[in-house]
């Protein structure tokens, strides 16, 4: 494989502080950003082939020596190039953005960050379908606006409530779009892109309560809701023998849940230098499809119903000693979306990634 990526970017930011009064000191931020990426990709494919008496005598060979020098010849096993036009592509990616944001405060208790970002995005792709015959010429562009609001209210020095909203975009990566087929050793499957992928958009809302009992200690509990339009998911692709995966857009999806964060020093029980950290979340997600579709509502691909991260940390600066013990647990999730049929008994089921634990 020969992969060449060239990129260039530039940015300009400006900030202005206003002194309206002692209780109101807003800050205005604005700026622009530009980025250009160009990719050239070429790959060559080789396969082992067998001719002549090789087929007749293959069953007699010792499998441990199939590829020995004695068996590599034009009438036994030899390498043959199978490269076609779909193994090469070129792509250009242009992003231009401008933003304006304001930091607002009303006294010492209420603070707000509000802003909007405008982005122009263009993607060009030239290549071939996996058959190496049909050319692919892609030219996508979109102009989007992404507003955001973050409001924090300080109940007192130790307690704070935060409310946030933001809109974001998930643009398909090169590997998710280009029709190039590559083999994933971890999945034991071929993976190819989908030139018809659309950008995925998300509207995110969070409500959090934050408690700071002492410096360096936090307790945060919050709820969140996310709405996804055109979420990108990895799916099974019917392609004859062997496994092959690709990517597609679902119609829309929702996710909501609760999250708890704790950071607590254990000095109060005589364990100086030892701290406890916990992060846990429960997430309920659901993907929805158009009425009449063979697809059935399910959890989002790649989304676990719960996450647990916890650990103990020891720090002794005088002795130069630090140590930690960590525990992570992730609930089972859909690794790859299957293929639904008109008759549910003929479905190709989803592939699940079961519970993952690391210590």
Regions of interest found by a model, annotated:
Residues 1, 41-47, 124-132, 174-180, ...:
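Outer-membrane beta-barrel translocator domains and adjoining extracellular loop/strand segments
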Residues 2, 6, 16-18, 32-40, ...:
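Transmembrane beta-strands of outer-membrane beta-barrel pores
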Residues 13, 17-18, 23-156, 182:
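Signature of Gram-negative outer-membrane beta-barrel scaffolds
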Residues 17-28, 43, 109, 156-158, ...:
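Short loop/turn motifs that connect adjacent beta-strands in outer-membrane beta-barrel proteins
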Residues 26-32, 112-116, 147, 161-163, ...:
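Transmembrane beta-strands of outer-membrane beta-barrel proteins
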Residues 83-96, 140, 169-228, 238-265, ...:
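Outer-membrane beta-barrel signature, preferentially recognizing the C-terminal barrel domain
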Residues 225-228, 244-337:
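Gram-negative outer-membrane beta-barrel transporters
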Residues 355-359:
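Conserved small/polar residues in nucleotide/adenosyl-binding loops
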């Amino acid at each position: 494989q020969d992969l060449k990526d060239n990129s260039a970017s530039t940015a300009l930011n400006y900030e202005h502080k206003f002194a309206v009064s002692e209780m109101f000191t807003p800050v205005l931020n604005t700026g622009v950003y530009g980025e250009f990426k160009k990719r050239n990709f070429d790959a060559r494919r080789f396969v082992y082939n067998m001719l002549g008496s090789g087929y007749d005598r293959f069953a007699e060979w010792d499998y441990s020596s199939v590829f020995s020098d004695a068996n590599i010849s034009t009438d036994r096993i030899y390498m043959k190039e199978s490269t076609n036009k779909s193994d090469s592509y070129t792509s250009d990616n242009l992003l231009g953005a401008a933003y304006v944001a304001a930091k607002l405060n009303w006294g010492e208790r209420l603070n707000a960050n509000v802003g909007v970002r405008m982005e122009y995005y263009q993607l060009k792709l030239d290549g071939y379908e996996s058959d190496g015959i049909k050319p692919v010429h892609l030219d996508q562009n979109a102009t989007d606006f992404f507003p955001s609001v973050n409001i924090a209210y300080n109940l007192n020095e130790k307690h704070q409530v935060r409310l946030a909203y933001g809109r974001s975009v998930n643009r398909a990566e090169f590997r998710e779009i280009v029709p190039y087929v590559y083999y994933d050793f971890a999945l034991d499957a071929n993976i190819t892109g989908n030139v018809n992928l659309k950008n995925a958009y998300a509207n995110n809302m969070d409500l959090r309560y934050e408690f700071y009992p002492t410096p360096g200690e936090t307790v945060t509990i919050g709820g969140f809701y996310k709405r996804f339009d055109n979420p990108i998911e990895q799916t099974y692709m019917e392609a004859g023998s062997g496994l092959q995966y690709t990517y597609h857009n679902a119609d829309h999806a929702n996710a909501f849940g609760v999250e708890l964060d704790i950071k607590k020093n254990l000095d109060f029980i005589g364990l100086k230098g030892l701290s406890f950290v916990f992060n846990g979340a429960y997430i309920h997600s659901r993907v929805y499809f158009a009425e009449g579709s063979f697809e059935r509502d399910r959890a989002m691909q790649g989304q676990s119903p719960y996450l647990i991260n916890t650990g103990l940390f020891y720090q002794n600066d005088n002795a130069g000693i630090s140590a930690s013990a960590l525990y992570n647990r992730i609930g089972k999730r859909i690794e790859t979306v299957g293929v639904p049929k008109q008759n549910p008994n003929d479905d190709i089921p989803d592939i699940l990634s079961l519970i993952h634990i690391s210590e």
